[in-house]
Amino acid sequence: MTTSFKGTKPSRRQFLSGAAAAGAGTFVAAQARAAGDPAITELQPWTQQLGDGVDVAPYGMPSEYESHVKRRTVEWLTADPISSINFTPLHELDGIITPNGLCFERHHGGAAHIDPAEHRLMINGLVETPLVFTMQDLMRFPRENHVYFLECAANSGMEWRGSQLNGCQFTHGMIHNVMYTGIPLRLLLQEAGVKTEGKWILPEGADAAAMTRSIPMEKALDDCLVAFKMNGEALRTEQGYPVRLVVPGWEGNMWVKWLRRIEVGDKPWHHREETSKYTDLLADGKARRFTWEMDAKSVITNPSPQAPLTHGKGPTVLTGMAWSGRGTIPRVDVTTDGGITWHQARISGPSLDKSMHRFYYEFDWDGGPLYLQSRAHDSTGYVQPTKDQLREFRGVNSIYHNNGIQTWYVNEEGIAENVEIS
Amino acid sequence: AEAEGPFGLGREALPEEIAAWDIDIRPDGKGLPEGRGNVWDGEGVFVEQCAVCHGDFGEGVGRWPVLTGGFDTLTDQRPVKTTGSYWPYLSTVWDYVHRAMPFGNAQSLTDDEVYAITAYLLNMNGLVDGDFELSHENFSEVTLPNEDGFYMDDREELELPEFTRDPCMENCKESVEITMRAAVLDVTPDEAVQTM
């Protein structure tokens, strides 16, 4: 990546720091002064030679210069790469929609490859008529389109004891936000006829983990979707192809992928993923169960440890994302001095229920150290707490639901670091 | 307005289809199939099918999950959460082993083998004697130590009022100091953090 330098001349200290882009920018700027910018004065091959034909990429991929924009994993987090996690590169994205190929993955039995012709969805239990649907059947129900975030309950979970991973991809990247096309779950349940005693559902996956979760009927009839498209195309294999459950605002574990069965019952099942896992151990040794909603949260994605400031002082764009499982985000505050003074950021793009929101704060960087934080407000009036406020209620062993305010320290060279501050 | 049906789509599920897929077990024993297995047989199956990852005594090999022990550690700095120390219900053990284990060969165990493994896990956790046999008949008599260790999400009453307040915007604190740094730990994958 080369950037031609504009604005204030970088300090000698920045030049000597050798940060790649800052150095290259300075070099280009010096050359440009001498004899014109060769990016302009010399004929480039892409200007002279022909590009690719339209038959080269029937399904296109990003530019070769964007190959660093990818999901990453952290090997030491899990025992193996099958029941594991990877992370969305939030620091490279903008807007609110996550590209399908970059949506983080969380599997418990690997990503199943399912032939849609052989896939079935069963509804059984406390219903008038237990039913089996083929994919062809499902495509004949009325559809809806909604943009929702899916956040893993464990997103930021490694940070409960303090700053650990250096980059918002790792601290906040167990999230994606896409437009789902699907059938209101309500319609499928009505087709089977839920009996009056039916108070809970148990969705189950067709993969080797046969993931199950108990979901109260009220939520099932409210806004859950049985989705088969994301961002306009079929679900990706790793996101549950051919069909998954969408549980807006609630922890990602409940969004059962490769959905093959929904049982209706009168009590929760207390299965492994809602007893051993996805329960939140508190300091007194007791644990919360059924912590479904994801609280309001935000993170600054640029600058951040993977996206340092390389342009020197002057006009600077700070951006990030905010979301809440309880509604929309009418406001985000940001601070550059560690919370002494806060400024209201600017939200740009659609403000949708239980979806990511994109915020910006443009400021004139004086080249001094920055202590960056963002603070989301949601439509219920909830204000994103600090990590210390959360620890007062929960201790440090609850693993899940860490929505505490993130701090990035940016030094004079523009290098950013994950820190905690007083 | 959206049509609300019914649409007459799908077909009735057959009893044998439901039986093939509806394998879930609840704490009250609903869903448990007939069968039985004792600690002795459970040890045999466990050593053959489970110990390569979970260890001969459920202690866990390498980074694989620890299944036993960890009693009275839930308030420790590093709690050890196992079937014995943390799980509330035995039904969850039966259900999960039956639906998802062994890892890589799920749903290969017979009902009697799952009863036997469950009995062996109880024994390794010191909760039953070596001559114990678990069956669909005595299943509900077994309670796990941490059954009462869980309560319903109470964030709405406890936390939300505290976090629903107008926040400070100016002169919010005197000074700012760094108290912890991720770079000191240095556990982030190297290639991910670039200065470009």
Predicted regions and their residues:
Chain A
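Intrinsically disordered/low-complexity terminal segments and short unstructured peptides
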Residues: 1-2, 7, 25, 46, ...
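A generic secondary-structure boundary signal that marks alpha-helix termini
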Residues: 24-25, 194
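Intrinsically disordered, low-complexity segments enriched in polar/charged small residues
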Residues: 17-18, 77
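N-terminal secretory signal peptides
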Residues: 1-14, 21, 28-29
